[in-house]
Amino acid sequence: MAVTDVDGDGDLEVLVAGYNGPNLVLKYDRNKKRLVNIAVDDRSSPYYALRDRQGHAIGVTACDIDGDGREEIYFLNTNNAFSGRATYADKLFKFRGGRFEDLLGDEVNEQRDVANRMAGRSVACVDRQGTGRYGIYIANYASGNVGPHALIEMDEAASDPSRGVIALTNVAEQAGVSKLTGGRGLVVGPIISQSRSDIFCDNEYGANFLFRSNGDGTFTDVAAQAGVEDPTQHGRGVALADFNRDGKTDIVYGNWNGPHRLFLQLSTNRRQRFKDIATQKLSMPSPVRTVLVADFDNDGELEVFFNNIAYRGPSANRLFRVSRREHGDPQIEELNVGEATEPDGRGTGAIVTDLDGDGRLELLISHGESAAQPISVFRVNPGTSNRWLRVIPRTRFGAFARGAKVIAYTKRSGPHSRIIDSGSGYLCEMEPVAHFGLGKDVATSVEVFWPDGRSVARRLELGDMNSVLEINYPTEEQEATAAAEIECGNGFIVNENGRCTDRDECTQFPPVCPRDRPVCINTYGGYKCRANKRCGQGFEPNDEGTACVAQVAYFGGTRSSGRGLGTQAPRLCVAVLGLAALQLP
C-alpha cells in the first residue's frame, strides 16, 4: 500500500497493490465515514488504467519523477516468478491528458527497453541529485546473475514534459547500486548524510546494503563499516526514526523468523556506526512483513508496529513503545495492540495516515498471499487530548518532498525529527507528512531540510498546534531566517543562520559540573558530568565515572544484549473504526 494524492484534490488516498485482482484507489468519504474505491471498472474513469487487472502487483510507491508537481505511481509486478525474470512488466502511471497512462508502455520507453521485468519486492523513491525529480529504486530478487537492483529516472535530455514525452532510463549502474541479491526491504532518507538521501536495503540470503550518498548522484555501500550487514538473516519490513532524539537517524527492521533489529546510530571518532538495542521481546523472531514507526497516541514517544503473517499457524501483530531516556538507550516496552493483534491475519502490508483529519493516525493493514482477507482499519482511543502537529514540505515543483527531514523543537521535550517517507515498511509507502505527537508540550519552531541541502526555519505559535502546516521549497530570501524569530528550547541556541544548534554547556564559565564530578561531556541538547577516572585501552569510564567498562564493540555479527522489562506495559486500546468492514467494489 502507498499514500498519495491520486485525484489532485488535496486529500490523501490509499493505493492498494492487487496480486490476484485489480489495484485499488481508496478515498475516504467523510460524510459516510468509509473508504470508497475510485478506480472502478469503467474505461471512461480517469483511474481505470491504475487497476491493471493483468498485473500481479505486490509493491507500490509514488513520487514526482518529471517535475510537474504531481506524483507518478509505480506498481511492481511479479507475475509467475519468485526471483529472476517475470512474465509481466512493472507499470509507471502518469496523469496525462485527463487520465492515468503507463509511461513504460510509451513507444519511446519500449524502444529503450527500460521496463523492469524482474521479480522485485520493495520499491521506493530517491532524489539522488537533489533536483526535486525522483527516481524509482527497485529492490529486485535476483536469480544468479539475473535481476540486479534497478533505478529508473527521467532522462531529461531526451524528454519534453511540456508535450508529455517522458523518456526513462535505468541509472542503477551509473549510481553504483546495481547489485545482485535477494532484495526485500527498502527505505530512503538522510540516514548517515546530513540531508542527502541515503538508501538502506535489508536482504535475503545476503548482507544488507547501506548506500551512502556521495553528494554527486552516486552511492557507496558502507553497511560493513556501519555494522548493519546482518548477513545471516533475511530482512523484511524496515523504517527510519530518531528514537533517542539525538539528531541521528536510527534503523528498525524485522527479519523473517529471525531476530528483529533496532539499530541505534552512534558517533564513534566521527564515524557513523550502529548498535542493536533490541530487547529480548522486541527481537523475538516472527514471520514478519511490514514494520512501521508512528506516534499513534500523540504522547510524544514513538511506537514500532510489527505486522506478521499467519505462516504455518497463528502469529499475532505486536506493538512496542520506544521512549527516550536521559543519557541512556531508549526504554522499550511492549504494548497491548488490542484488536489489531490479528493472530490469523495473512498480513502483506501496512500504512499509517490520518484519514479523517482529526490529527490522530489510522493504521491500515492489507492481507492476502495464502488466503484472501479484507483490509483492516484501526485507530487508537487514548491520547485524544494530546497536542499534535503535521508538516507537509513541498519540492520546488510543488510535489510532496519525499526524503526531506523535518525537525520540530519543543519547549520541554527537545527536538523531534521525522523523514518524509519515500517508501518503507515492506512493499509500502507511508503518507508524505511529518506527524508529531506532542503530548502536553508545545512546538516552538520547525525546520525542514531538503535532499539538496536547502533548509528553512519557521517560528511556531500556540495557535499552530493541532494543525497542518505546508512548507514550500525556499527561495534564497526565504532560506534566511532572523535569529530573533526562532525559539529552540532548552539545550539549544540559534546560530547565525537562524537554525537551532546544540548548546555546548561544557564551555560555559563557571563550570556546570560539581567538583566531585568535574568531567563535563556535551550531549545533544544537554550534558552529563562524571568523575575524573582514567581507563586502559578498550575501556571507558561508565556514566558516573566510578568504574571502567568495555567500550561498545558490537558493530555487526551477533545481536547485542538488550535490557528486558519485567513490568507490565500499559494497555493501548486499539478500536476498529466504523469503516473496518470495507465494502469495496
Where are these regions (language model features)?
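Gly/Ser/Thr/Pro-enriched helix-cap/hinge segments flanking short amphipathic alpha-helices
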Residues: I136, A158-S159, G164-I166, Q272-M284, ...
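Beta-propeller blade repeat segments, especially FG-GAP/WD-type strand-to-loop junctions
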Residues: P22-V40, G84-L104, V146-V171, A207-V222, ...
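Acidic/hydrophobic-patterned starts of short beta strands in beta-sheet-rich repeat architectures
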Residues: G8-G18, G67-N77, G130-A139, S193-D202, ...
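Repeat-based blade/solenoid architectures
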Residues: Y19, R43-T61, E107-C125, Q174-V188, ...
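Solenoidal tandem-repeat scaffolds enriched in leucines and small polar residues
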Residues: F82-G84, G97-R212, G217-A224, D230-L240
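N-terminal entry motif of extracellular EGF-like repeats
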Residues: I486-V512, A531-Y554
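C-terminal GPI-anchoring signal of eukaryotic secretory precursors
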Residues: V552-R571
